[in-house]
């Protein structure tokens, strides 16, 4: 009897006044707990393969696998889906299929955004945005207003509005309003478009005002935005300066050139430029073609040789900056081949590779094609990074007052550190003379990477900063260091051109950790040490041959030691 007294009863007595009249706090707690459990159970329908009792499929363009859904859940939560499924109620098809593009009258909703939307539909809970599709691959970005974050919120807004979920519309409208003032004006355009299509008046007015007071040129606005919005922006711009809009001849001529580009008529472009006093640069024709034309048309425009590939438009963007925004390798490569400078910065301190990173989602960066090749977005970043590494001496207009050291500035500095370290390894006397002349020692406290020759973990050292040092001082110090190293490398190119070419050949492998670091030859297994020595000796032989070639070429110098000969040449340049 005593044993049964301590066991929980299998039935609940309702005679107790405490149980029959529970307090409001207890009732609320149990209700919340029950709702939480219900929400979790419904989520299993989406995430657990064992609970796959779906009865319809949504096919999203370019996605191999459709998204399976339960019509009863969607119909209960959304009037749009209720009306949609009513039409097919008598259909003989067991699992009807719906194309996302047919459901949306405007805009786009990708797979990840739709799954995020469905998660709310099933559970009633709005989760944080998934990092792999709502952030960028720029390591110094806060991801509070970068393009992937905006695009994901815009897609969710289209889904929420079209599929008639008012509470989500309100939530995402607040989020998008926060983005408008934080983001670059070109990133505001997709927000403006979703506000226009979804009748979000407050958000639309905010976007129009932001674009109107920006320096975004009229031809870009005409290309991107609906006529109704365009007229409002024009009116606001006229009011802000109190000057009536005048259609001057240069704008008219520019418009004709750009319309010819819109029709892919490069011959007409050439004719218009020949017959008028406007140039392709003045019309920003190459910028426009790179932004909007087919890559083949861009190549044809480049072949006219009528434009400066490093010309800046009124906003400070070079053609390569615009190409980085488009992220099309078949446009970026011809521009670089024509001499576009990958190291040029915008007025606010962004380079082409930095722009490209801020537009690229981690998912797109890491995804490979069916043939196991990198995605075209990663390819664009790789091309631009390699170009910066290949031409580190072309510094562009490097900013000196950035709030954080730009990632491509770190990359160039790392490249130069490793290159000078490699030169020290093979001809220390000559390298030390060149470094003395460039006053590298005076900047060595920046990183301390040159002795011993840098290994491949130097990025960690580059990241170590003095917490008491302001961002301005830190960036300025790094630039001083970089300029000294650039001068050292330039000296090597001038006096040892063959050695310079050999180092060029091996630097990409060195940066990718394919060349052994001989600072620690004892590291690794016996086989690894043997391979390391063989690889090192192969490189050493190539450098020796190149050095002998340079020595013969400079036989006119003094027959004294190589270091003194170089020093004399540096101190008394002819």
UniProtKB/Swiss-Prot annotation:
Residues 373-516 are annotated as: Salicylic acid-binding core (SBC). It is found in: Nucleus. Pathway: Protein modification; protein ubiquitination. Residues 54-130 form the BTB domain. ANK repeats lie at residues 252-280, 281-311, 315-344. Changing residue 469 to I: Normal salicylic acid (SA) binding. Changing residue 423 to F/E: Impaired salicylic acid (SA) binding. Salicylate binds at residue 419. Changing residue 419 to Q: Impaired salicylic acid (SA) binding. Interacts with NPR1 in the absence of SA, and lost ability of SA to repress this interaction. Changing residue 459 to A: Slightly increased salicylic acid (SA) binding. Changing residue 426 to L: Strongly reduced salicylic acid (SA) binding. Interacts with NPR1 in the absence of SA, and lost ability of SA to repress this interaction, thus leading to faster NPR1 degradation but reduced PR1 induction. The keyword Amino-acid biosynthesis does not apply. The keyword Zinc-finger applies. Transmembrane segments: none annotated. GO terms for cellular component: nucleus. A zinc finger (C2HC NPR-type) spans 133-147. Changing residue 470 to A: Slightly increased salicylic acid (SA) binding. GO terms for molecular function: identical protein binding; protein homodimerization activity; salicylic acid binding; zinc ion binding. It comes from the Eukaryota. Changing residue 489 to A: Impaired salicylic acid (SA) binding. Interacts with NPR1 in the absence of SA, and lost ability of SA to repress this interaction. Disruption phenotype: Enhanced susceptibility to the virulent bacterial pathogen Pseudomonas syringe and to the fungal pathogen Erysiphe cichoracearum (powdery mildew). The double mutant npr3 npr4 accumulates NPR1 proteins (while NPR1 transcripts level is normal) due to reduced NPR1 degradation by the proteasome; this leads to a reduced growth of the compatible pathogenic bacteria Pseudomonas syringae pv. maculicola ES4326 after inoculation, but impaired hypersensitive response (HR) and subsequent systemic acquired resistance (SAR) induction when infected by the avirulent strain Psm ES4326/avrRpt2. Salicylic acid (SA)-binding substrate-specific adapter of an E3 ubiquitin-protein ligase complex (CUL3-RBX1-BTB) which mediates the ubiquitination and subsequent proteasomal degradation of NPR1 in the absence of SA. Together with NPR3, acts as receptor of salicylic acid to monitor immunity in a NPR1-dependent manner and induce systemic acquired resistance (SAR). Involved in the regulation of basal defense responses against pathogens, and may be implicated in the cross-talk between the SA- and JA-dependent signaling pathways. Forms homodimers, homotetramers and heterodimers with NPR3 in the presence of salicylic acid (SA). Interacts with TGA2, TGA3, TGA5, TGA6 and TGA7. Interacts with CUL3A, a core component of the cullin-RING ubiquitin ligases (CRL). Binds to NPR1; this interaction is disrupted by association with SA, probably due to conformational changes. The BTB/POZ domain mediates the interaction with some component of ubiquitin ligase complexes. This is Regulatory protein NPR4. It comes from Arabidopsis thaliana (Mouse-ear cress).
